[in-house]
Amino acid sequence: LYVEGENQNGVPFCSYTDEIYHRTGYATEVYTLGNVSCDNYNVGYSDARGNTWYFYYNGIKKTNQLLERIDDVPATSNDDIEKKEQITGQAYFLRAFFYHQLYSLYGRIPLVYHTFDMNAEWTETRADMDEVADSIVADCNRAAQLLPTEYSSNDFGRATKGAALAVKART
């Protein structure tokens, strides 16, 4: 599952981890110091790069599309089944991560678990804080069940069971 390696403002996702070394006075210090809030989140190259809601809900849409269609993909061997499980786990992890980012910034957010028909009316409302947290935890639990604890060096950067449990712990 492909997702951009930076947020909508051009700040790399690695800035959110403890594996980054802060060298400049640029936007990364907001992340490395743990000072991200809805008041200072739009830091980066330019506010014109996009908005937070669009960026994360676009990622949520992609994960929902995958989760709705993954069962249509045939799996005839044990390797195929294992690969499908890993891809499904990655989708649950990414959806949890995207919701966690929105939850951290805005609290009550709409929870969307399906794709929309182009002619459908938008009727989603913001969920309660506990409902959002429970949703993130549920996706993290699903991801942790499906993801491996590590990958080969060729798959560096993919979501692991530990990453899913870390997002769960932060929620």
Language model region names:
Residues 1-22, 39, 82, 87, ...:
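Acidic, glycine-rich segments characteristic of secretory precursors and extracytoplasmic regions
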Residues 5-7, 102-111:
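Proline-centered turn/helix-capping motifs that create local helix->coil transitions or kinks
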Residues 5-9, 120-125:
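An N-terminal domain-start capping segment
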Residues 26-106, 121-123, 127-132, 140-156:
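Conserved, well-structured interaction surfaces
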Residues 92, 165-171:
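TPR/Sel1-like alpha-solenoid repeat signature
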Residues 115-118:
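Short edge-strand/loop segments of extracellular domains
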Residues 157-167:
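Amphipathic alpha-helical protein-interaction segments enriched in hydrophobic
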